[in-house]
Structures are given as C-alpha cells and as structure tokens.
Curated annotation (Swiss-Prot):
Molecular function per GO: 4 iron, 4 sulfur cluster binding; iron ion binding; NADH:ubiquinone reductase (non-electrogenic) activity; quinone binding
Pfam family, one: Fer4_7
Cellular compartments annotated: Cell membrane
NCBIfam families, sorted: NuoI, PRK05888.1-3
Organism encoding this protein: Mycobacterium marinum (strain ATCC BAA-535 / M)
Gene that encodes the chain: nuoI
GO biological process per UniProt: aerobic respiration
Biological role stated in the UniProt entry: NDH-1 shuttles electrons from NADH, via FMN and iron-sulfur (Fe-S) centers, to quinones in the respiratory chain. The immediate electron acceptor for the enzyme in this species is believed to be menaquinone. Couples the redox reaction to proton translocation (for every two electrons transferred, four hydrogen ions are translocated across the cytoplasmic membrane), and thus conserves the redox energy in a proton gradient.
Record note on quaternary structure: NDH-1 is composed of 14 different subunits. Subunits NuoA, H, J, K, L, M, N constitute the membrane sector of the complex.
Cofactor(s), names only, from the UniProt record: [4Fe-4S] cluster
The protein, known as: NADH-quinone oxidoreductase subunit I
Known catalytic reactions: a quinone + NADH + 5 H(+)(in) = a quinol + NAD(+) + 4 H(+)(out)
C-alpha cells in the first residue's frame, strides 16, 4: 500500500508541473544579464592619453597555472613609445584553449594593465582564433586618446601615470604647479 501511495505522490508532482508556465531562455537572441563581477575575456588597458599600461614584465605569464599567457617585452625608445615606462609588451598572447579563468594573472599585474571583461561569448569553430593576440586584447581607443606610439605627457613621470595624474590632455594642473591633491 505504501508503494502505491508513493507512486501517486510522484504522479501528483508531474501533473502539477504540467500546468505551470514554461520559462524559456531565448539565448542568443535575447541574452540575459551578466553578473557585474563575472570573469570573462581579458583586456589590456590604456592610460587616458592612449599609452598602454602593459610594461612587458611577464608577471602575468609567470602567475598563470595553465601556461596560457605568452608575453615578450621590448624597450621603448623616444621615437617609438608604447607605454610610459622603459618597456612595453611587444607580443602579448592569451590562449583561451588553456585559460581556466582563475584571475591570477590579474592579481599579478603591477600596473593594473590586465583586467577581465564581462564578455563571455568566446566560442569559435577554429582553434587558431582562440589564441588572442595583442590587437584583440587591447582596449579600444576612446575619441580623446592618441594612438601609440607617441611621447608621454609633457613633464609626466612613470609615477604620474601610475597614480592617475595623466589625462587625455596631459598632466593635471595640480601636479604641474607642485600642489598635492
């Protein structure tokens, strides 16, 4: 008798769910909201004047447990300046076939050059397209930015860039006159 009642209870759950409204996710036509702190695709950031934040130190590659990042640094010159410091990341690659999305590379970056966006659609039908080169990782230039290579802001030091004292127009006025903010 108990087995019979168990099966009736199971059928009751089934019949009850038959009359509930079905919830269908219409993805990819209507993608849902993404969590604000979601770790998606990586992005190489820029300073407000357009220079790259990456200094080619390779700490992100050392921190990556999956060995998914390859960085080759090069020296900046006065004629060809890509970042405010001595060096820049000449070659930067992230292999998304290996990346596990742990974020250790983000924590290792001393200049906050590498961050993760909310972009989660990384699927592709070609394996070679999942190895992102520097041109696909760099943040897009904003209208007020100047495309590198170009000299750093007049009178600015590496420290000014790191502290955020450089804008698209140049070094902030409070820093030029020696005032503290």
């Amino acid at each position: 008798m108990a087995k019979f009642l168990d099966s009736i209870a199971g059928f009751g759950v089934t019949f009850g769910s038959m009359f509930k409204k079905t919830v269908t996710e219409e993805y990819p036509e209507k993608p849902g909201p993404v969590a604000p702190r979601y770790h998606g695709r990586h992005q190489l950031n820029r300073y407000p004047d357009g220079l790259e934040k990456c200094i080619g130190c390779e700490l992100c590659a050392w921190a990556c447990p999956a060995d998914a990042i390859y960085v080759e640094g090069a020296d900046n010159t006065d004629e060809q300046r890509f970042s405010p410091g001595e060096r820049y990341g000449r070659v930067y690659q992230i292999n998304y076939l290996r990346c596990i999305g742990c974020g250790l590379c983000i924590e290792a970056c001393p200049t906050r050059a590498l961050t993760m966006t909310n972009d989660y659609e990384l699927a592709d039908d070609n394996r070679a397209d999942l190895i992102y080169e520097k041109d696909r990782l760099l943040a897009p230039l904003q209208p007020e930015m100047t495309a590198p290579p170009h000299p750093r802001a007049a009178g600015a030091t590496d420290k000014d860039y790191y502290l955020g004292n450089v804008t698209a127009e140049g070094l902030r006025e409070t820093q030029k006159t020696g005032e503290s903010r």
